[in-house]
From Swiss-Prot:
Binding of ATP, residues: G15, P16, T17, A18, S19, G20, K21, S22
Annotated positions for site Interaction with substrate tRNA: T106, R128
EC number: 2.5.1.75
Protein name, as recorded: tRNA dimethylallyltransferase
Function: Catalyzes the transfer of a dimethylallyl group onto the adenine at position 37 in tRNAs that read codons beginning with uridine, leading to the formation of N6-(dimethylallyl)adenosine (i(6)A).
UniProt source species: Rhizobium etli (strain ATCC 51251 / DSM 11541 / JCM 21823 / NBRC 15573 / CFN 42)
PANTHER family the UniProt entry points to: TRNA DIMETHYLALLYLTRANSFERASE
InterPro entries assigned to the protein according to its UniProt record, in alphabetical order: Dimethylallyltransferase, IPT, P-loop_NTPase
Length: 297
């Protein structure tokens, strides 16, 4: 681990699910008087602590952790929202003399963190809430039809069932009178200078990773994932809500309805996690350049 000790303004750690990156983040944070900052798009939600593998109090080992479970399950949350939360958090960490240790499996978060993000306009909260309410009550087809009327070019490029992107495009059009496409080419400020950060991508051997995934999903069921999904389903969220797409939700929901056995949930949940990890590994290999240290952990 000695070659990981030379750092400047931040440590960035990414890798597939179940790769051991969260434990590495805690280890390095302890060495550098650091604070761990979540960079996983599912671990921001408050409802699914177990199912999204948010670190437990024991796993945190007394190290400060930020941006975990701070978003209600019903709320929309984007890469831009995460970047704004990070920008608001960093001054406090700097003032406390704490090194930010970013960790998570959402590659787009790291791209935005070090490369900037499209400079989108501010959206009035009332408008945002209205469109999300309409998404639940009216469904994606109605909002897609509305977007087709006001911004047909953008609508043509979207999946008509992608409620989150449809709502986002409508938000911008209604708030500004302009297409979201007008803003997507404008890049906002870089939050972390990639040249002044230690960057690590954890890429375990596939057999090791699969063994961890298989054991982890069973442990999640033992630790209360079923109760979490019950609580989530009780909220009555639309199927296209991001939190509803967390791996394990559909499988456990099927078990609760009597449509799947516990053994089938274990098999299908682990299989879905392995497929997700494979997609992550491919993305990291293709998107993370040689400035990212490859680490088997």
């Amino acid at each position: 681990m000695e070659n990981l000790l030379s750092v400047e303004n931040a440590i960035l750690i990414t890798g597939p699910t179940a790769s051991g990156k969260s434990a590495l983040a805690v280890e390095l944070a302890k060495r550098h008087n650091g604070a761990v900052v979540n960079a996983d798009s599912m671990q921001v939600y408050d409802t699914l602590r177990v199912l999204t593998a948010r670190p437990s109090e024991e796993e945190m080992q007394g190290v400060p952790h930020h941006l975990y479970g701070h978003v209600p399950a019903w709320a929309g949350y984007s890469t831009g929202a995460w970047l704004r939360d990070v920008s608001a958090l960093l001054p406090a960490l700097r003032a406390a003399g704490q090194l930010p240790v970013f960790v998570g499996g959402t590659g787009l978060y790291f791209k935005a963190l070090t490369g900037g993000l499209s400079d989108m306009p501010d959206i009035p909260e009332a408008l945002r809430e209205e469109l999300r309410r309409r998404l639940v009550e009216e469904g994606t087809d109605a909002l897609y039809a509305e977007l087709s009327d006001v911004d047909p070019a953008m609508a043509a490029g979207l999946n008509r069932q992608d409620g989150q992107r449809i709502v986002r495009a409508l938000e911008v059009t209604k708030a500004t009178g302009r297409s979201i496409a007008d803003f997507q080419g404008r890049s906002g400020p870089v939050v972390i200078d990639a040249d002044e950060a230690r960057k690590i991508v954890v890429l375990p051997d596939r057999a090791v990773l699969h063994a961890r995934i298989n054991g982890r999903f069973e442990k999640m069921l033992q630790q209360g994932a079923e109760d979490e999904v019950k609580a989530l389903l009780a909220l009555g969220l639309p199927a296209e809500a991001p939190v509803m797409k967390a791996i394990g939700v559909s499988q456990i929901a099927a078990m609760l309805k009597g449509e799947m056995t516990r053994d089938e949930v274990l098999e299908k949940g682990a299989a879905a996690t392995r497929q997700y990890a494979k997609r992550q590994m491919t993305w990291f290999r293709n998107q993370m350049d040689d400035s990212w240290q490859r680490l088997t952990h």
